[in-house]
Amino acid sequence: GYRARNAEALLDEVEMLHKDYGITYISFQDDLLMTSVEHTEEVCRAFEKRNLPVKWNCNGRLNYCSKELLQFMKDTGCVFINYGIEAMDNEVLKRMKKGLRTEKVIQGIEETLEVGISPGLNMLFGNYADSRETMKKAVDFLIKYDDFSQQRTIRPVTPYPGSPLYYDAIRMGLLDGVEDFYENKHLNSDLLCVNFTELSDDEFYDCLEWANKTLLENYHKESHKRVMNQIEDIYQNRDSTFRGFRHAASPTTGHVTMMS
């Protein structure tokens, strides 16, 4: 079973990293930091108690999101939550056994944005029941809720050895074991490994190409707009806070990745 680390012990390490090494940003890579409301609140209370000038991010689960919890996370330094949404179609989510519906996804993402936390919106394509229509739903969702803090792209589903999809692929004759997976099928995370949809491989790639072109064009259009606004601001308004066109300002200066 899974046993979460004690929140106070976790913050002992965060405090040491800040005091001894000047770390001001922590990335928790544990998939289960938000394993429950109680554990997440314990971590937040530990941050609150230490009152450290440290920002942090984590992986999150929309099952456990509430506006109150998100606000507590924001108030104690959380600036980014990486969500594994995977799909914006209820039939696809049901087949994946995600325990989520699109209504809950939308509510959770809207509340995350409302409290001022940036959400990571991770999508996959190629699960059972995926189609051109479900891909369009995913793209529409990503564009609507894009805060432009990251480039959003969609990757194909990968049936990693040991996962339920891996054994499905074996049973269906789409994979011939671990060696076939690593040597022949899983050549690149952006390329199709096993096609579980009713689309042909060419149609599958057409969907991915359209989706990612659309998402990246949307991102770079906004990026161009922001740069043009910066240029206007520095010269027309004499903005003294401007730090240079070649300076990539990042919230992750002094960044450490941790497991919780």
What are these regions (language model features)?
Residues 134-138:
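Short alpha-helix in the alpha/beta-hydrolase fold that links the catalytic acid
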Residues 164-169, 177-260:
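Radical SAM enzyme core and accessory elements
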Residues 19-22, 52, 146-147, 170, ...:
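Proline-centered flexible-loop/turn and helix-kink motifs
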Residues 140-148:
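Basic phosphate/pyrophosphate-binding loop/patch that engages nucleotide-derived ligands
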Residues 38, 91, 95-96, 125-133, ...:
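Flexible glycine/acidic-rich beta-alpha junction loops that bind and position SAM and/or redox cofactors
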Residues 119, 149-153, 217-224:
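Bilobed periplasmic-binding protein-like "clamshell/Venus-flytrap" ligand-binding domains
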Residues 1-119, 125-127, 140:
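Radical SAM [4Fe-4S] cluster-binding motif and immediate context
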